Amino acid sequence: MMRLKQLNEMSASEFIHLLGGVFENSSWVAERAEPNRPYSSFQSLYNKMVEIVETASDNEQLKLIQMHPHLGTNVKITDFSQEEQKHAGLNELTKDEQNHLILLNQKYKDKFGFPFVMAVRGKIKQEIFRTIKERLQNNHQTEFKQALEEIKKIAMFRLQEIFREGENNSMTKHKERVMYYGKGDVFAYRTYLKPLTGVRTIPESPFSGRDHILFGVNVKISVGGTKLLTSFTKGDNSLVVATDSMKNFIQKHLASYTGTTIEGFLEYVATSFLKKYSHIEKISLIGEEIPFETTFAVKNGNRAASELVFKKSRNEYATAYLNMVRNEDNTLNITEQQSGLAGLQLIKVSGNSFVGFIRDEYTTLPEDSNRPLFVYLNIKWKYKNTEDSFGTNPENYVAAEQIRDIATSVFHETETLSIQHLIYLIGRRILERFPQLQEVYFESQNHTWDKIVEEIPESEGKVYTEPRPPYGFQCFTVTQEDLPHENILMFSDEPDHKGALK
């Protein structure tokens, strides 16, 4: 291993400087381990350092234990200890928890004469509180031995951290590898979330806000970082956040979320997760709305919307995506954010044509100057200012319901020459209504029905069936540069002199 080779070849002072903190503020362990180089493996190095501690005098062992800081302390501690306590959430204690831990630490030290030591990597604060209470019941000899055992565990984690960094540097210096893991289908439902109000209204849509009596979301989370490499290459789980923990994290944070949008919730989860787990370098979240529709009930003899009963929708739903990374200075940065509307299916029974396309020996599709058009649409949009997507300033927030209503309105108004033309016009209208958006992206599919009965006596109707399985699709991005006005063919409310719709 490259790092081990470097370790064996570096000077004595470099060796001691690198490993002096493996045992808390006790560089004498590294000093005594240095002359035994070269080491053949990580394990042989660790075994030698443990042997040095085990064969040290009682006084040296006591001083080693006393070098460890109290858990949850506010005084300056080593970088190793700071990171370990941060992983366990000890930097986020409430005032009451902080005072309780101080009291337990003092009781422990008063009884045994040295601080409570515990390898907190992978532990949660509740487990730490429980353990210190249990160990307060032990005698001095038992706790002295237990403290040394915990110190050995801590040393193992710290050595792994040092070797992991070296291995990560050597394995990723040529090309950044794909490396992430996560949890999908994290369903969370919240009743009585803060309502979304103050949204700017537009002519195409009656939408003005959401009451959020019932808020449902399906989240997919993935995380990554160079420190996770050995979880793949060596099965080392010491820095692995279990995906079940991710699920719990997301669901419980919906309870403390004070915002009003899926986009804002994803940002809240991402920020909280990276603050909680400082070794995670990047996080991606996808949120899909689980929509519920209003039902009606008779109240005092009148029909009115029910505030108790809702119907799960099988129709279109809002989506959001967010990617956040940790910078070298430990600040967090959103590298990508996108809002969306998925699963919108629209049928327009007339006023659609498809003519003038290439005809050759492969063409069997007839031209049609007035056909039904059934389209599936996924629409995604990006803001010029990412923070506008969170809904904290509702005047700048663009709701999926408004995007839906613009799409249906433009579809109704426009003499549709093709799906390509339709999505372009919808995108332009969206950007005209919402100049705070940077671009709108479309994924569309053509699911126009096949005609079965051409003419029905004394009726304008026809009979259709589902199309054959292959379907056409289109992808297109509309940007602010597309906004200069052009002539758009639209229906008027009145027929022309020939009886045809303009």
UniProtKB/Swiss-Prot annotation:
<comment type="similarity">
    <text>In the C-terminal section; belongs to the uricase family.</text>
</comment>
<keyword id="KW-0560">Oxidoreductase</keyword>
<dbReference type="InterPro" id="IPR002042">
    <property type="entry name" value="Uricase"/>
</dbReference>
<keyword id="KW-0456">Lyase</keyword>
<feature type="binding site">
    <location>
        <position position="420"/>
    </location>
    <ligand>
        <name>urate</name>
    </ligand>
</feature>
<feature type="binding site">
    <location>
        <begin position="81"/>
        <end position="85"/>
    </location>
    <ligand>
        <name>5-hydroxy-2-oxo-4-ureido-2,5-dihydro-1H-imidazole-5-carboxylate</name>
    </ligand>
</feature>
<dbReference type="GO" id="GO:0004846">
    <property type="term" value="F:urate oxidase activity"/>
</dbReference>
<dbReference type="InterPro" id="IPR017580">
    <property type="entry name" value="OHCU_decarboxylase-1"/>
</dbReference>
<feature type="active site" description="Charge relay system; for urate oxidase activity">
    <location>
        <position position="243"/>
    </location>
</feature>
<dbReference type="GO" id="GO:0019628">
    <property type="term" value="P:urate catabolic process"/>
</dbReference>
<dbReference type="GO" id="GO:0051997">
    <property type="term" value="F:2-oxo-4-hydroxy-4-carboxy-5-ureidoimidazoline decarboxylase activity"/>
</dbReference>
<keyword id="KW-0511">Multifunctional enzyme</keyword>
<feature type="region of interest" description="Urate oxidase">
    <location>
        <begin position="179"/>
        <end position="502"/>
    </location>
</feature>
<feature type="binding site">
    <location>
        <position position="354"/>
    </location>
    <ligand>
        <name>urate</name>
    </ligand>
</feature>
<feature type="binding site">
    <location>
        <position position="446"/>
    </location>
    <ligand>
        <name>urate</name>
    </ligand>
</feature>
<dbReference type="InterPro" id="IPR036778">
    <property type="entry name" value="OHCU_decarboxylase_sf"/>
</dbReference>
<feature type="region of interest" description="OHCU decarboxylase">
    <location>
        <begin position="1"/>
        <end position="178"/>
    </location>
</feature>
<keyword id="KW-0659">Purine metabolism</keyword>
<dbReference type="Pfam" id="PF01014">
    <property type="entry name" value="Uricase"/>
</dbReference>
<dbReference type="GO" id="GO:0006144">
    <property type="term" value="P:purine nucleobase metabolic process"/>
</dbReference>
<comment type="function">
    <text>Catalyzes two steps in the degradation of uric acid, i.e. the oxidation of uric acid to 5-hydroxyisourate (HIU) and the stereoselective decarboxylation of 2-oxo-4-hydroxy-4-carboxy-5-ureidoimidazoline (OHCU) to (S)-allantoin.</text>
</comment>
<feature type="binding site">
    <location>
        <position position="419"/>
    </location>
    <ligand>
        <name>urate</name>
    </ligand>
</feature>
<dbReference type="GO" id="GO:0000255">
    <property type="term" value="P:allantoin metabolic process"/>
</dbReference>
<feature type="binding site">
    <location>
        <begin position="116"/>
        <end position="120"/>
    </location>
    <ligand>
        <name>5-hydroxy-2-oxo-4-ureido-2,5-dihydro-1H-imidazole-5-carboxylate</name>
    </ligand>
</feature>
<feature type="binding site">
    <location>
        <position position="244"/>
    </location>
    <ligand>
        <name>urate</name>
    </ligand>
</feature>
<protein>
    <recommendedName>
        <fullName>Uric acid degradation bifunctional protein</fullName>
        <ecNumber>4.1.1.97</ecNumber>
        <ecNumber>1.7.3.3</ecNumber>
    </recommendedName>
</protein>
<feature type="active site" description="Charge relay system">
    <location>
        <position position="194"/>
    </location>
</feature>
<dbReference type="Pfam" id="PF09349">
    <property type="entry name" value="OHCU_decarbox"/>
</dbReference>
<comment type="pathway">
    <text>Purine metabolism; urate degradation; (S)-allantoin from urate: step 1/3.</text>
</comment>
<feature type="binding site">
    <location>
        <position position="243"/>
    </location>
    <ligand>
        <name>urate</name>
    </ligand>
</feature>
<keyword id="KW-0210">Decarboxylase</keyword>
<dbReference type="InterPro" id="IPR019842">
    <property type="entry name" value="Uricase_CS"/>
</dbReference>
<comment type="pathway">
    <text>Purine metabolism; urate degradation; (S)-allantoin from urate: step 3/3.</text>
</comment>
<feature type="binding site">
    <location>
        <position position="371"/>
    </location>
    <ligand>
        <name>urate</name>
    </ligand>
</feature>
<feature type="binding site">
    <location>
        <position position="69"/>
    </location>
    <ligand>
        <name>5-hydroxy-2-oxo-4-ureido-2,5-dihydro-1H-imidazole-5-carboxylate</name>
    </ligand>
</feature>
<dbReference type="InterPro" id="IPR018020">
    <property type="entry name" value="OHCU_decarboxylase"/>
</dbReference>
<feature type="active site" description="Charge relay system; for urate oxidase activity">
    <location>
        <position position="183"/>
    </location>
</feature>
<comment type="similarity">
    <text>In the N-terminal section; belongs to the OHCU decarboxylase family.</text>
</comment>
<feature type="active site" description="Proton donor; for OHCU decarboxylase activity">
    <location>
        <position position="68"/>
    </location>
</feature>
